[in-house]
Every structure is written in structure tokens, then in C-alpha cells.
């Protein structure tokens, strides 16, 4: 009988370059993140869309950074209701319908994060009470985690019929398009920190004392466009001189054209030494000093107590930080490129004081660490050696235990 065929060993299909490829991708991603400056200005467009009709309620574009481009968005409630909303006659087709919409409270429920029991699009994500996170109602709905707040604008309720000024220009209180239900959308702190890579949806319902509250849905989208091709930024000519200045060249006195008469003292004309070129530190300090002079002439009230800072990364903006309770800017910039200024001028000792504080912090940090952590940071091979020795000892101990168990068994 023919025996079974001998099985061939499986070929290792592991790519030997796999770890290196993954490491390269991670390094490239890390470099791209570091080069992405938070001060980069882009063209940011926010768009509010009525998902029931597909019409745009608001489209606001502005130039700003990704951390600051969060404007207030203004639109009208009728942009979300439409001309005919439900079978009861609610809608914004007529001036009377627009005026009637002003008498209702409304509440908003998030569709990007739907809590349990809040339903789906049909219920406007407001399937039960407690799902609402914002709105304009007598119970003042609010939330600490939602991304936006939506409130009514400043139009008084006694404005009168909402006539279109292009049709009824002689009617008191007429507005362009008959818009008399202004809404104001603002971003919360959570909204400023959230990711807006995809549209986010909310449901809005009018509150009625009887019957079912009508539903509409809207989305909020952010579109980011580059303001133009990025020109490669070379080295700053101000900071090219990074090496210490060389010693001044010894100037030799000019040789007299004719020898002096016997017994007369030789007269050597005095020559002025060549002017020394300012170093990189002096040039950077002159930039900050120039910014201070410009501020002192244009807005002297802004420099009563302020920090002038140079940002080290592109696009090389020069920032003016005014002291206040807004944010600890010196900690954010690691206190390495800030100079204190007031009406007396730029304090040139600020950098030395900051370096001293940084040195003290570093010493305090090193003193608070244990001896093992400090040794491992100073000598990376020490950690590798300890790990190898400990691993060998553990293996020997296991083998010894196994040998003793075998002998006694």
C-alpha cells in the first residue's frame, strides 16, 4: 500500500521588509504631524443644509486657522421649516405662516450621537424627553457635551406680519424675503474640539401643547480649502548666521610713503576698526524690538503688560500675547522665545530669566525621578543589559525548578 505523500514544510510568507515599511510609515506620519503648523491659515466654509428639502440655509466662509475658525452662523427658522411643513398648515409660504412660526418654542436633538431611546430620523432623534440638548423653550434645554447651541435671534415677537419687503415694501416691519424668525448657531467648547471630517446631523421639533410636534432635520458641514499653493520656505536670512562671530581682523597700519626725517617720531594715522556684524540672537531681538516699536506707536494700550513671541515653525508668524485670564501662552510656547515688554521698552533680560527657570525645572524634574529611571535615560544600554540578565536568570530558574521536579518524580 502506498504511503502518504510527505508533506512539505510551509513556506514562510512573512515579508522581511514588513517591520521596516511599517516603521517608515509611522515616521512619515509623525513628521507630517509635526510640520502641520496650528497657525496655518485656510479657507473654511461652514454649511447648514435642510435635509428635508436639500436647500442650503447658511453658507459662511472665512479665513482662519483650524482652531479658531468657528464663527456664529445666522439663518432663519423658515429655512429649516420650508413652505409646507405638515398637514396642520404649519409652513412659511405666507406672511401669516411665518408669523405663526414665531409663536412656537423649539428644541433640538443630536443625530451624530444618539442616546438610547431617542429614536432615529423619523423622530428627529427626539424619541423621548431628555434627548434635547439645545433650543428655545420654556424649560431651557441644554447640554454639556453637544457640539452646538441653537437659539432665536433678537427679532421682537411684536414685529408684526412677516411681509416680504421686495413685494410689500410699504408695510411696516417687512423684511427681505419675509424672514422674521432669525436663529443663531454657536459652537460649544466640545464643538471646537470635535472632528468635523464628516457632516453631523440634528433634528429640530416645534413644541405644541397638543398633537405631535413636527420634525425637521438639518446637517452641519465644514469644508477646508487651501488658500493657494504653498511656496517652499527657505532659511530665514535673519537666522543664517548661527555660528559665533569670528575675531576681528588685525588691521595693519599703512606704510608711510616717505621715510620720516631723522629724529622725528613716526606718525601712524588712526584707522577705525571694521564694524562687527550682529549675530543671529541680536537680529531676532531686533525683530521683536521692531514689533514693540510698531505696537507702541499704533496701540499703546495693548503693551501695558504683554509678551512678544516668535513662533519657530512655518509660516513664521510673529504673535502678540496680552496678559490676561484667557490662556497660559508662555507655557504653550514653552517659554523659550518670549520677551516681556511694557511702556518702558523691551526687557532684554527676559530670555536669561526664562532659561534660568527652565534649568531649575529640569533639575527639579531629574531630582524627582528614581535612580533606575535616571540611569536608563542617561545610558540606554543599561536598560537592555538589565533586561537581558533578568531574562537569562528567569530562564535558568525555570530550568532548575523543572530539573528538581523531574528528579523527585
Curated annotation (Swiss-Prot):
UniProt superkingdom: Viruses
Membrane topology: Single-pass type I membrane protein
GO CC annotation: host cell endoplasmic reticulum membrane; host cell plasma membrane; membrane; viral envelope; virion membrane
UniProt-listed GO biological process terms: fusion of virus membrane with host plasma membrane; symbiont entry into host cell; virion attachment to host cell
Signal peptide start and end residues: 1-32
Function: This envelope-like membrane glycoprotein is responsible for ligand-independent activation of the erythropoietin receptor EPOR leading to the abnormally rapid proliferation of erythroid precursor cells. In the first stage of Friend disease, constitutive activation of EPOR by gp55 causes uncontrolled, polyclonal proliferation of infected erythroblasts, leading to polycythemia (massive increase in the number of mature red cells). Host susceptibility to SSFV-induced erythroblastosis depends on the expression of the truncated isoform of MST1R receptor tyrosine kinase (MST1R isoform sf-Stk).
Protein name: Glycoprotein 55
Biological classification of the source: Viruses, Riboviria, Pararnavirae, Artverviricota, Revtraviricetes
The encoding gene: env
Amino acid at each position: 500500500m502506498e504511503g502518504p505523500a510527505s508533506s512539505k514544510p510551509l513556506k514562510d510568507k512573512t515579508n522581511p521588509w514588513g517591520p521596516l515599511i511599517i516603521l517608515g510609515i509611522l515616521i512619515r506620519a509623525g513628521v507630517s504631524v509635526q510640520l502641520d503648523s496650528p497657525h496655518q491659515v485656510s479657507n473654511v466654509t461652514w454649511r447648514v443644509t435642510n435635509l428635508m428639502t436639500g436647500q442650503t440655509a447658511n453658507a459662511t466662509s472665512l479665513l482662519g486657522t483650524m482652531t479658531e475658525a468657528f464663527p456664529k452662523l445666522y439663518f432663519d427658522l423658515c429655512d429649516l421649516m420650508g413652505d409646507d411643513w405638515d398637514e396642520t398648515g404649519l409652513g412659511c409660504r405666507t406672511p401669516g405662516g411665518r408669523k405663526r412660526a414665531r409663536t412656537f418654542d423649539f428644541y433640538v436633538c443630536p443625530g451624530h450621537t444618539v442616546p438610547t431611546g431617542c429614536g432615529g430620523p423619523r423622530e428627529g432623534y427626539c424619541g423621548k424627553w431628555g434627548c434635547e440638548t439645545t433650543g428655545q423653550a420654556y424649560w431651557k434645554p441644554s447640554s454639556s457635551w453637544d457640539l452646538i447651541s441653537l437659539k432665536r435671534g433678537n427679532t421682537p415677537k411684536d414685529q408684526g406680519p412677516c411681509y416680504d419687503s421686495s413685494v410689500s415694501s410699504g408695510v411696516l416691519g417687512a423684511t427681505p424675503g419675509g424672514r422674521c424668525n432669525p436663529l443663531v448657531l454657536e459652537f460649544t467648547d466640545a464643538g471646537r474640539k470635535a472632528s468635523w471630517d464628516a457632516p453631523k446631523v440634528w433634528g429640530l421639533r416645534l413644541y405644541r401643547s397638543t398633537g405631535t410636534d413636527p420634525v425637521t432635520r438639518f446637517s452641519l458641514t465644514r469644508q477646508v480649502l487651501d488658500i493657494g499653493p504653498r511656496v517652499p520656505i527657505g532659511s530665514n536670512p535673519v537666522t543664517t548666521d548661527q555660528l559665533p562671530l569670528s575675531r576681528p581682523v588685525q588691521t595693519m597700519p599703512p606704510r608711510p610713503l616717505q621715510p620720516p626725517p631723522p629724529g622725528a617720531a613716526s606718525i601712524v594715522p588712526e584707522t577705525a576698526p571694521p564694524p562687527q556684524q550682529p549675530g543671529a540672537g541680536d537680529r531676532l531681538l531686533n525683530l521683536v524690538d521692531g514689533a514693540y516699536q510698531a505696537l507702541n506707536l499704533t496701540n499703546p494700550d495693548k503693551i501695558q503688560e504683554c509678551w512678544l513671541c516668535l513662533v519657530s515653525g512655518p509660516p513664521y508668524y510673529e504673535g502678540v500675547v496680552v496678559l490676561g485670564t484667557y490662556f497660559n501662552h508662555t507655557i504653550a510656547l514653552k517659554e523659550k522665545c518670549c520677551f516681556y515688554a511694557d511702556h518702558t521698552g523691551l526687557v532684554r533680560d527676559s530670555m536669561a530669566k526664562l532659561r534660568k527657570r527652565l534649568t531649575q525645572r529640569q533639575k527639579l524634574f531629574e531630582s524627582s525621578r528614581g535612580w533606575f529611571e535616571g540611569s536608563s535615560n542617561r545610558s540606554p544600554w543599561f536598560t537592555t543589559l538589565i533586561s537581558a540578565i533578568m531574562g537569562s536568570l528567569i530562564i535558568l530558574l525555570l530550568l532548575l525548578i523543572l530539573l528538581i521536579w523531574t528528579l523527585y518524580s
